[in-house]
Design a protein with these regions (language model features):
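N-terminal periplasmic accessory domains that precede
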Residues: 33, 63-66, 80-83, 102, ...
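Outer-membrane beta-barrel translocator/receptor signature
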Residues: 126-133, 141-190, 215-218
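Short, acidic, small-residue-rich periplasmic hinge/interaction motif at the N-terminus
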Residues: 21-56, 77-78, 119, 124
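Short acidic/polar hinge/loop motifs at secondary-structure boundaries
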Residues: 69, 96-122, 220
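Outer-membrane beta-barrel signature, preferentially recognizing the C-terminal barrel domain
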Residues: 423, 433-483, 490-491, 508-519, ...
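Transmembrane beta-strands of outer-membrane beta-barrel pores
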Residues: 150-154, 178-182, 240-246, 285, ...
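Extracytoplasmic beta-strand/coil segments of soluble accessory domains associated
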Residues: 64-98
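Face-selective signature of the C-terminal outer-membrane beta-barrel domain
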Residues: 217-245, 267-411, 418, 422, ...
Length: 681
């Protein structure tokens, strides 16, 4: 029994999928990589570990509500998902295995022992998310667990059902979901201006347009798990997704050629249907008291049908009729070792994709890509000083005459020093690569307006980013959490949309910039003045710079995003408010306004039921503006009002149940392919 206990705890440290079932005192003793403990939070070199009080567990309906009490986390009432204040990408792990919000909801709050919050993801997950949450549970109950969520609103409606059954060493989970974006009478509005020169002529293109999007999404999945804690774990899972998204746009144009004015009109539509089946096989074996081996294979298939149409007065009609089929396989093998205050992980991941694209009028294009990665990571502690060192060696390739093969290292160094019980200082240095999307490497094009198109570029290659960050943390338990940092990030070969003149037309074409950089500061504060009130703010100041070529002109600008969240609880009632403010962020050759989040949400809980009412953008309209940088050869300015969100009301009902007696928890997919190959309209 002692051997099994040590194995499960060691594996939890390494984020490998073994069940943590031990008393907190044993965990605290074994996890000697801890550098500072203050109240309910234990600080480590790359994460904070959160433990929960009996009152917090009692107040939470399910596991997700409990996890959302961690500083910098919340449940976004608009999307009904776990989120950070700034909306960073989150990867949820349950006992080390990639999981979903739904998986977390199916776990009773009383079964969560602790949560590791990685603000610096381990090397294995570095390219998957900004934040990693590893939820460590005790054994789940044998029996049934289920949840139902529905939302009915003016802009969209949503529903999902999840059910799980645990019996002996087996667990079966089934889920179904549907999302419906309504075709409303309210349209989003945009005004804009294009100014450019072409062939000695001067063009000015002013327009006002209205646009609306609608569609439906369906998903379902089944997963079977069989395993013995401390010995082996096998999971076979399959899921299926169907998406149909439509767009319609009407444009009214004042056109001028060398000062001669004309009035025109234009229409555009886009209809995309995607089917995506996925199958995953996961196996894990405990080799000894200190080592574990894991293998995972994921197969995904995308089937896309895309029909896009654009037309303007006095211009030819442009029709995009695209049929694409993409198949991919991702395989991973990981070995982990952990003993006392030392941990080591080593692994290999290979991702291989094949896309067959049939574009009407252009024939068939075959694209084959591959991404192979070897990585290792070591961490340890010496007194008040802790460190984590990792290295990934990666090769990105695209086959064919216009293909490429690029090799890159992605090292990470993380150092931490304990100043005292409430203060901690860390230094992060790392590098990573990003692969272009399939359609960024495609020559397919779509008409934007007369003499203006968008297209990919077969010659683009992967980009490499370098980050440096000095992080300071301060904690008064269950009262005030502050994290602030100063950072400098630089990306070589940055992927962006360039303005390219080709013949008698302009193209918005994917290219690699010489460099993109940002330097600045960020501060995240969570303040709990009273038990019933929680306030959160995430604010940044960044100086962003882009330089297209080594000898070209650079453009710099400041970006000041602010994210606010407030929540209050009185008995069975809860009120939450979320607001986003910000200036313009630099996106390639555009200064783009930050699309905002704003809502008020009121909920009432009764037994296993929860009833809610929401209003999106109750105080102001969702407006933002975009404009090209000063040296861009084309001037493009837009003002957008997303009227479909303004004062949008929705009502929610959710229900959950948990019945049974002791057993263990569930698993979900480990790897995934999210690049469908659909053309960006």
């Amino acid at each position: 029994m002692k051997k099994s206990l040590l194995i499960t705890i060691f594996a939890a440290v390494s984020l490998l999928p073994v069940h943590a079932q031990q008393p907190d005192s044993v965990i605290t003793e074994i996890l000697s990589a801890s550098v500072i403990t203050e109240g309910n939070i234990t600080y480590k070199v790359d994460r904070t570990t959160h433990f929960f009080s009996a009152a917090e567990v009692k107040a939470a309906r399910d596991g997700r509500e409990l996890v959302a009490t961690i500083p910098n986390l919340l449940i976004d009432k608009q999307s009904n998902t776990l989120a950070t204040l700034a909306g960073k990408k989150i990867l949820i792990l349950i006992n080390g295995i990639k999981s979903t919000d739904t998986d977390l909801q199916l776990i009773p709050a009383s079964k969560i022992k602790k949560v590791d919050f990685y603000d610096v993801p381990p090397v294995r997950y570095m390219d998957m998310a900004d934040v990693v949450l590893n939820v460590v549970t005790s054994r789940l109950d044998t029996g049934w667990n289920g949840s139902v969520y529905t939302r009915v609103g003016q802009m969209y409606s949503h529903g999902d059902v999840a059910l799980s059954r645990v019996s002996g060493n087996n667990k079966l989970t089934v889920n179904l979901g549907g999302h419906f974006n309504h075709k409303r009478k309210v349209w989003d509005e945009e005004t804009g201006e294009f100014s450019y020169r072409l062939g000695g002529d001067e063009y000015k293109y002013e327009y006002s347009q209205k646009q609306r999007e609608w569609g439906n999404q369906y998903s379902g999945g089944v997963a079977w798990l069989n395993g013995k804690p401390g010995d082996y774990m096998l999971q076979i899972s399959a899921d299926y997704s169907f998406f149909n998204n439509k767009m319609s746009r009407d444009r009214y144009i004042d056109f001028a050629l060398n000062g001669l004015k004309d009035t025109r009109s234009g229409v555009a539509s886009n209809d995309v249907t995607t089917m995506k089946p996925t199958v995953d096989v996961y196996f894990e074996k405990t080799l000894s008291e200190t080592s574990t081996l894991m293998a995972d294979v994921t197969a995904t298939s995308y089937s896309n049908d895309q029909n896009a149409f654009t037309s303007e007065t006095d211009a030819f009609e442009d029709l995009l009729d695209l049929r694409s089929r993409k198949n991919s396989v991702i395989g991973e093998l990981v070995w982990s070792y952990a003993k006392e205050n030392r941990t080591f992980n080593a692994g290999y991941r290979g991702a291989f994709g094949f896309l067959r694209s049939d574009l009407s009028g252009s024939g068939v294009t075959n694209v084959r890509t591959g991404r192979q990665r070897l990585y290792g990571e070591y961490s340890s502690r010496h007194g008040s000083f802790s460190y984590r060192v990792s290295l990934g060696a990666e090769n990105n390739m695209k086959a064919g005459d216009d293909g490429f093969s690029r090799f890159a290292f992605s090292p990470t160094v993380l150092l931490s020093y304990r100043l005292n019980k409430r203060n901690m200082l860390r230094l992060r240095l790392d590098s990573e690569t990003s692969m272009p999307d399939i359609q960024q490497m495609s020559g397919n094009r779509i008409l934007i307006m007369e003499n203006f198109y968008r297209r990919g570029n077969a010659e683009v290659h992967n980009s490499t980013g370098y980050q440096s960050r000095l992080i300071y943390s301060y904690n008064i338990p269950r009262k005030l959490i502050v994290q602030t940092d100063a950072h400098y990030n630089r990306t070589a070969g940055f992927l962006y949309d360039a303005f390219v003149q080709d013949g008698d037309a302009w193209y918005l074409e994917t290219r690699n910039a010489h460099r993109f950089s940002e330097a600045g500061m960020n501060m995240i504060v969570t303040y709990i003045p009273w038990k019933w009130l929680r306030l959160g703010v995430d604010v940044s100041a960044d100086r962003q710079t882009i330089k297209e070529t080594s000898s070209g002109e650079a453009f710099s600008d400041w970006f000041f995003p602010v994210y606010l969240n407030a929540s209050a609880v009185w008995g069975n009632w809860s009120l939450s408010c979320r607001q986003t403010f910000g200036g313009k962020m630099l996106d390639g050759l555009y200064r783009k306004g930050l699309e905002k989040v704003s809502y008020l949400s009121l909920t009432y809980g009764w037994k296993n039921w929860q009833f809610g009412a929401q209003c999106l953008f109750p105080f102001y309209d969702d407006k933002y503006s975009n404009e090209t940088v000063s040296f861009a050869p084309v001037r493009h300015v837009t003002q957008t009002n997303l009227r479909t969100k303004n004062r949008e009301f929705g009502f929610t009902i959710s229900w959950f149940f948990q019945r049974g007696k002791e057993n263990h928890s569930a698993k979900s997919l480990e790897n995934s392919d999210v690049d469908s190959g659909v053309f960006r309209f």
